[in-house]
Every structure is written in C-alpha cells, then in structure tokens.
Design a protein with these regions (language model features):
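Phosphate/oxyanion-binding active-site loops and adjacent basic polyanion-contact surfaces
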Residues: 4-9, 49, 119, 190
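Short amphipathic alpha-helical face segments that pack within enzyme cores
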Residues: 7-15, 126, 189-192
Length: 205
C-alpha cells in the first residue's frame, strides 16, 4: 500500500513515455487546482488545452474543434473505495474496492449527477472494449451513495469542448482524510489501462 498524491499523474506520465509508435496522436495534460475549482492558467478551466491543440493541428490544415470532436479523453482521477468503517456512505453494489483494478466512472458529482460529466453509452463501450481486449482488470464505481456527498472531477470541464470524456482512476480508502490508502496493484493496473488506451488501434466511430 502507499499514499496517493499524484498517482494519476504518475500513471499517465509513465504510460505516455511507454507508448511507442501509437496509431493515433496521444496527448497527456497535467493540471492543478482541481480541489479549488480548476481556475487560473494552470487549471483545467483555462484555455491552454484548446489553444495548444489549435496551434498543433493548424500546421496540418485541421480545425481544433473537429479534432476535439473526433477524440476521446480519459480523465485520470481517484475514486472513493468502500470504507467498511463508514459503510452507510456507500452503495456497495455500485462502488469501488481496493485491489480490483482502476475504476471507470460514467459520472461523478454530488446530488446525483450535479456538477459532472456524464459519459455516453458509446464512449463507455469504447473504453470497455479497449480494456477487455488488453486484459486489464477494471471495475465500475460511483463516488458514494447518491445524494449523500460525493464530488466532481475535471471531466466536466474537458467535455465542454465536445470531447468524449470518461473518468478513470484508482480507488482510495479514506479519501481526503489525513491518511489515504491505495493499492500498488491498482496503480499498476491504471498505468496498464492508460497505456492500452494510448496504444489501441481502435478509432472512435
């Protein structure tokens, strides 16, 4: 077990480094201030991503908005694992557990689907197919019982660019507590999941 600071960034960075000759262009973006609104020029609400892609694709005579619409994004962020000490806060059949692989979340947010991205069934199927073909163990989970707390991710901001986005991350025991616990196996499998996504020959339809 290990503590979780920057686990998602580590897994994504390691996968980007190991993605040799992918069929499609891969981009890994690191942002901060996620816990305080994702504001500022280094938060996900900045124009950096769109401006970067616009500059990048214009050299090929392409439109940034068309490239974004044809892309798929994994928003790497942790998810709350079922805590046996606070079982009433979780819907056990819809939440994640340690040592079962990364969590793929159709939606996060609080109060049901408030302040969230809601991935389409087609996008969920696209990611599921990639992970299953790569034989990467994974699980589906939500951030606690509906209408009982919860939290959002930057997927809500990414998806405003008409970019299909899905949350994925390791489950965390006691998220936001002074001591958080994750599984090294889940961290490794998150790396494998992101690498499989980067290296997949599948194109979005």
């Amino acid at each position: 077990m290990l503590s979780r600071p920057r686990l998602s960034a580590y897994a994504a960075f390691a996968a980007e480094l190991d993605a040799k000759d992918p069929d499609f262009t891969t981009i890994t973006v690191f942002t901060d201030k996620e816990e305080t609104g994702s504001d500022g020029n280094t938060g996900m609400q900045s124009l950096f991503l769109k401006d970067f892609i616009e500059d990048f694709v214009s050299a090929y005579g392409l439109s940034a908005r068309h490239v974004l619409m044809k892309s798929v994004c994994l928003s790497a962020d942790v998810n709350a694992a079922v805590d046996p000490a606070f079982g009433e806060a979780f819907e056990r059949n819809n939440c994640s557990y340690l040592n079962r692989g990364p969590v793929v979340s159709k939606y996060t947010g609080s109060g049901g689907k408030y302040s969230t991205n809601d991935a389409s069934a087609e996008t969920m199927g696209f990611i599921r197919t990639i992970l299953e073909k790569a034989e990467v163990p994974w699980q589906v989970g939500e951030l606690g019982r509906v209408d009982n707390g919860g939290g959002g991710t930057i997927a809500a901001y990414i998806s405003t660019h008409n970019l299909d986005t899905v949350d994925i991350g390791v489950p965390v025991l006691s998220m936001h507590a002074p001591l958080e616990i994750t599984s090294k196996a889940d961290v490794y499998l998150l790396y494998k999941a992101i690498l499989a996504f980067y290296m997949s020959p599948m194109a979005k339809e």
